[in-house]
Amino acid sequence: MNRVATILLNRNLPDVTERLYEHLARFDGDLTDIFVVEAGSDVELLSRYTTWHANSDEVVRRGLRYGRGMNYGLSQLVKEGKFGEYDAFFLLTNDTEFNEGPTLAPLLKVLDDHGRVGILAPCSERWGERLLLHREPTKYFWFIHNNAYLLRRAFVEAVCDMEEPDVMGFLFDGTNFRGYGAEHELIAKAYANDWAAAITSQVWARENESHLLEKADQIKTEGYEDNLKIYVAEGRRWMRKKYGFNSHWSMQQYVKCFYDRFFEYYPEFSQYKV
């Protein structure tokens, strides 16, 4: 049995999804099983590697986005009795790109070396965080904006809703549809439950935004600028309603409190603090 379940999220971009699938199968096929979630894709635009096709009227109209999509995939693994077979889950949007070579082997090495890391993200060459990873290639952070997370199963089990695994609340809060601030909430849950969130430069990843810029109509979403405005506006309303926070800064400070407390309990990891 492979150690990792990789979940790829696709909406009407089969060629893009298949390239990523084949990259992972080529370089990491001995470590991962790959599952493709179709987020309301048109039948003629399904990937040939499709595992599950979410095709309710609402999903066909709006898609799933990252949070609901990953909830869907993880919930399916639970319902099919496969969830407990894996050590970790690699959650990817199909516009994620990696360098030629293995991705999961070095990430799993980091996860094995850092026993309290529950969330691990490869670094991006566009991130300022890369400047903090010269001497120590892996550091623990209180903010990681990414569409490529490797999650330890023990962490997921500590914070997920195993009693009612579904698209709206298994791991991510599905009421935050586009996901602005969702990474804050997930990382806060990690540190509040004695798990760390880390970025590593052992693997590099990037998001190919050209698909949203050039194929918004095919994906059936708003154009890049409109999508960004709605993403922020919806997320700020969600933060206000759920937490009473009026700004992104307040949410960050909320997470930072749990982050600092983690190192009070685990001073042996202080070398990984930023």
Over which residues does each language-model region extend?
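A conserved acidic beta->alpha catalytic loop
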Residues: 30, 36-46, 97
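Active-site-proximal specificity loops/subdomain of glycosyltransferases
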Residues: 44-86
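Short, acidic, metal-binding catalytic loop of nucleotide-sugar glycosyltransferases
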Residues: 22-32
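N-proximal low-complexity "stem/linker" segments adjacent to membrane-targeting elements
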Residues: 1-22
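Aromatic-glycine-rich donor-binding/catalytic loop that engages nucleotide-sugar donors
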Residues: 151-180, 189-195
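Short beta-strand-to-loop acidic/aromatic patch adjacent to the donor-nucleotide binding site
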Residues: 84-97
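Conserved catalytic core of nucleotide-sugar-dependent glycosyltransferases
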Residues: 99-168
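C-terminal catalytic/acceptor-binding lobe
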Residues: 175-274
